[in-house]
């Protein structure tokens, strides 16, 4: 799934537009591999497995001594990470944007919402639904962060800054899917049962970010991923405004603001890792870039379309909600913010990773040009989320 980041699908899901090292790098001290099941097991269709095969999975690739890096950063995290959380009493809640069911004017408010939604085209709804489903798979994302060695919430109520951040971040994110879900439900424009099935399939399938229980890789992944969601929700806000639904624009804009705040926090973690362990951190950035940042919803399935995520991504690309150019811009922003080009004292492997990362954005922009050329010949496919209507990719 090359360059598939919540809206970009420049190749099939079979992998990368960029070279990918076939062997593990020398930096890996201890790692185990979860192999594919045997032919006998693999040939049997299982009810609760991803719609397609995930990669051979590497686990616990971070050398054990590196855990000390994250132990030593606990005070830093308490002072520099937790400040990017908002107190619950100061956070917006979904009810702030929705018709009040306890109000005498509830029915009229719902009618007004539905009238506004009549002006919104079906392809926009496809993208908004895809974004909502991605947000609703939040249990998977908290699970992913809690796979990371050295920072996981060991008990479910651990009081380290890392664990506090993960729980509170999850609590803030939980409002996003709730709000979009309720808005779409009230709109009357979508097939909620198909959407709900897609959410259940997605959470059941999990995700395959290839972060290897390694917090270096995990925080690089989340930094870039949060940049993507900020851009995506920001663009859905812009389009909602163009379609005349100012309330929906406000909803998407408020979610985008949260995502930007979270992006800043995760970006600061990688920035700090580059300060205390520049070689280890730049190798992690290079590793994730070579693998390609797969989006959390890349195993999306509705019971019908085996390529649902690719189709949703293609619509998002066509509408300008999230494109390869956006990915290049996000990557360029982070590489500049992290001052990767200025790193010195790196190992030979670190310098190769540095060169690769710094030269990646221009290569992605060339791929964007090819994608635009292919888009002129795009087909149309049905989306169960909008009652099987066909949408151009």
Curated annotation (Swiss-Prot):
It comes from the Eukaryota. It is found in: Plastid, Chloroplast; Plastid. Fe cation 1 binds at residues 135, 173, 176, 259. Its cofactor is Fe(2+). GO terms for cellular component: chloroplast. Binds 2 Fe(2+) ions per subunit. GO terms for molecular function: metal ion binding; stearoyl-[ACP] desaturase activity. Fe cation 2 binds at residues 173, 259, 262. Keywords: Chloroplast, Fatty acid biosynthesis, Fatty acid metabolism, Iron, Lipid biosynthesis, Lipid metabolism, Metal-binding, Oxidoreductase, Plastid, Transit peptide. It catalyses: octadecanoyl-[ACP] + 2 reduced [2Fe-2S]-[ferredoxin] + O2 + 2 H(+) = (9Z)-octadecenoyl-[ACP] + 2 oxidized [2Fe-2S]-[ferredoxin] + 2 H2O. InterPro entries: FADS-2_CS, Fatty_acid_desaturase-2, Ferritin-like_SF, RNR-like. GO terms for biological process: fatty acid biosynthetic process; fatty acid metabolic process. Residues 1-30 form a transit peptide. Pathway: Lipid metabolism; fatty acid metabolism. Its main location: plastid. Its EC number is 1.14.19.2. Homodimer. Belongs to the fatty acid desaturase type 2 family. Converts stearoyl-ACP to oleoyl-ACP by introduction of a cis double bond between carbons 9 and 10 of the acyl chain. This is Stearoyl-[acyl-carrier-protein] 9-desaturase, chloroplastic. It comes from Solanum tuberosum.
């Amino acid at each position: 799934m090359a360059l598939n980041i919540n809206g970009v699908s420049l190749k099939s899901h079979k992998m990368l537009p960029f070279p990918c090292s076939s062997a593990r790098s020398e930096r890996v001290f201890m790692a185990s591999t979860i192999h594919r099941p045997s032919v006998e097991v693999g040939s049997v269709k299982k009810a609760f497995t991803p719609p397609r095969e995930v990669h051979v999975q590497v686990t616990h690739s971070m050398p054990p001594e590196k855990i000390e890096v994250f132990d030593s950063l606990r005070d830093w995290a308490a002072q520099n990470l937790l400040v990017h959380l908002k107190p619950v009493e100061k956070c917006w809640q979904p009810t702030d944007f929705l018709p009040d069911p306890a109000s005498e004017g509830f029915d009229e408010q719902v009618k007004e919402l539905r009238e506004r939604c009549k002006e919104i085209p079906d392809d926009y709804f496809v993208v908004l639904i895809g974004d909502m489903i991605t947000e609703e798979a939040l249990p998977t994302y908290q699970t992913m962060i809690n796979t990371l060695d050295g920072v996981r919430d060991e008990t479910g109520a651990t009081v380290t800054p890392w664990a506090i951040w993960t729980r509170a971040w999850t609590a803030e994110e939980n409002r996003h899917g709730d709000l979009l879900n309720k808005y779409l439900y009230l709109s009357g424009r979508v097939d909620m049962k198909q959407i709900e099935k897609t959410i259940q399939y997605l959470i059941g399938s999990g995700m395959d970010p290839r972060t290897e229980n390694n917090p270096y890789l995990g925080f690089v992944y989340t930094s870039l991923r949060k940049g993507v969601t900020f851009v995506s929700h920001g663009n859905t806000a812009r389009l909602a405004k163009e379609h005349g639904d100012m309330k929906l624009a406000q909803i998407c804009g408020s979610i985008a603001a949260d995502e930007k705040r979270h992006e800043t926090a995760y970006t600061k973690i990688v920035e700090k890792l580059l300060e205390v362990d520049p070689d280890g951190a730049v190798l992690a950035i290079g590793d994730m870039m070579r693998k390609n940042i797969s989006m959390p919803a890349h195993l999306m399935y509705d019971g019908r379309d085996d390529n649902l995520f690719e189709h949703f991504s293609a619509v998002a690309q066509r509408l300008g909600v999230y494109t390869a150019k956006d990915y290049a811009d996000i990557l360029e922003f982070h590489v500049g913010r992290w001052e990767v080009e200025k790193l010195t004292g790196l190992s030979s492997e670190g310098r190769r990773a540095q060169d690769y990362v710094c030269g990646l954005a221009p290569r992605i922009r060339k791929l964007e040009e090819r994608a635009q050329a292919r888009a002129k010949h795009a087909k149309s496919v049905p989306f169960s989320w909008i009652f099987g209507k066909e949408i151009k990719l």
